[in-house]
């Protein structure tokens, strides 16, 4: 899977393998856990301006991540609150 806005990587992708999603097992109980090579969890929005782990009233939520209050990047602006 190539780099995209669901991996927490820079958009547009700078290239290389740093923005490719991979599956890794953290432990047997947790099962498959998908992470991105740049350190973010796939499914979270890629805002560099901050995230909130719980719903904040902003409509743009992915995999339990939502845009921080100060976010105005394209991913956060893709939906309206």
UniProtKB/Swiss-Prot annotation:
Induction: By abscisic acid (ABA). One of its GO terms (molecular function) is zinc ion binding. InterPro entries: Metallthion_15 (IPR000316). The keyword Metal-binding applies. The keyword Metal-binding applies. Pfam families: Metallothio_PEC. It comes from the Eukaryota. Keywords: Metal-binding, Metal-thiolate cluster, Zinc. PANTHER family: EC PROTEIN HOMOLOG, METALLOTHIONEIN-LIKE PROTEIN 4A-RELATED. Binds 5 molecules of zinc. May have a role in Zn(2+) homeostasis during embryogenesis. Belongs to the metallothionein superfamily. Type 15 family. This is EC protein III. It comes from Triticum aestivum (Wheat). The lineage of its organism: Eukaryota, Viridiplantae, Streptophyta, Embryophyta, Tracheophyta.
């Amino acid at each position: 899977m190539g780099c995209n806005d669901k991996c927490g990587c820079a958009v547009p992708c700078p290239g290389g393998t740093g923005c490719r999603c991979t599956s890794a097992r953290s432990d047997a109980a947790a099962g498959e856990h998908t992470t991105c090579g740049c350190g973010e969890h796939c499914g979270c929005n890629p805002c560099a301006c901050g995230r909130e782990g719980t719903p904040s009233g902003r409509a743009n939520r992915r995999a339990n991540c939502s845009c921080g209050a100060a976010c105005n990047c394209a991913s956060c602006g893709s939906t309206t609150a």
